[in-house]
């Protein structure tokens, strides 16, 4: 017997996942698809140890840790943060009030909450290399331990200014809303190769980073998730979080068909991490990483970002060929803005775009 209710209205659902180490441009892709496909509901399971960036047309950079960046959607009605979220309530309120247009904000009652005690615990040290010390890991562990007195979002928000701004919902209410929504977009956090299950342990994050986990953390019902299109985000030169030599920390290895290089060697300005503001490490493209991520995440289409980074058009085409052995590259990005993303450019068009942006 089908579980789909008679009022099921979902026509399309886009899931955005990162196929590398994060910072591939998921926020840019989310903004682009939000404007292009106009979802009514945005879903996310955020954590304060990961940030998304969207550069608006006027050059203003919008950095979110708690809210998705598909807010460019002209049809947006509601943002829903699922039960797998780890919420920094102060940051959530700050981002919500800064939105260009206030829409309904729903948060699942069972989302974890970062409290000062969690930040203090992580500030004391003893964490994995690359930790942002945001309190996210400690908050998540506190939820899993299920000790008496542990506060989840539904209780914690009662004494916070968010109370009255946000709608706290249970699973049934969220399901009913999602089933009645025509178009949904869900944004993943971090990157596949940082997954605690699939990454280079212990040089990883505290949770799984796959399409399956995104679906679970957002609380998407199976009958919604099974029609989803998965768009995987990649960059021509993947990056990792910075080393912290003063603390004796190394952020981990790369794939065997990849080598570490320097931004200066590529003629590029140094990049810095969104959350910790530390210099990023950069590597050559790994086909092994791309193929593994595509298979594990069920990627249907790929967004390839920073297409102007390779030293020649031929080098860019080699990367495209490696990806398209497994999945179609549907979107190509050449810059930080939504207007720098191109949908299904031909190889001839790519030649002109590469020449223009490479200058």
Swiss-Prot record:
SUPFAM superfamilies: P-loop containing nucleoside triphosphate hydrolases. Its cofactor is Mg(2+). ATP binds at residues 23-27, 51-53, 190, 305, 308. It holds the Pfam family Adenylsucc_synt. Its EC number is 6.3.4.25. It catalyses: dGMP + L-aspartate + ATP = (2S)-2-amino-2'-deoxyadenylo-succinate + ADP + phosphate + 2 H(+). One of its GO terms (molecular function) is ATP binding. DGMP binds at residues 23, 49, 131-132, 146, 205. GO terms for biological process: 'de novo' AMP biosynthetic process; IMP metabolic process; purine nucleotide biosynthetic process. It is an enzyme of class 6 (ligase). The keyword Magnesium applies. Pathway: Purine metabolism. The active site is at 23 (proton acceptor). Coiled coil: none annotated. Mg(2+) binds at residues 23, 51, 274. Keywords: ATP-binding, Ligase, Magnesium, Metal-binding, Nucleotide-binding, Purine biosynthesis. SMART domains: Adenylsucc_synt. L-aspartate binds at residues 274-275, 280. PANTHER family: ADENYLOSUCCINATE SYNTHETASE. Involved in the synthesis of the atypical nucleotide dZTP (2-amino-2'-deoxyadenosine-5'-triphosphate). Catalyzes the condensation of aspartate with deoxyguanylate into dSMP (N6-succino-2-amino-2'-deoxyadenylate), which undergoes defumarylation and phosphorylation respectively by host PurB and guanylate/nucleoside diphosphate kinases to give dZTP. dZTP is integrated into the viral genome instead of adenine by the viral DNA polymerase. This Z-base probably completely replaces adenosine and forms a triple bond to the opposite T-base. The resulting non-standard viral DNA is called Z-genome. HAMAP family: Phage_PURZ. Belongs to the Caudovirales PurZ family. This is N6-succino-2-amino-2'-deoxyadenylate synthase.
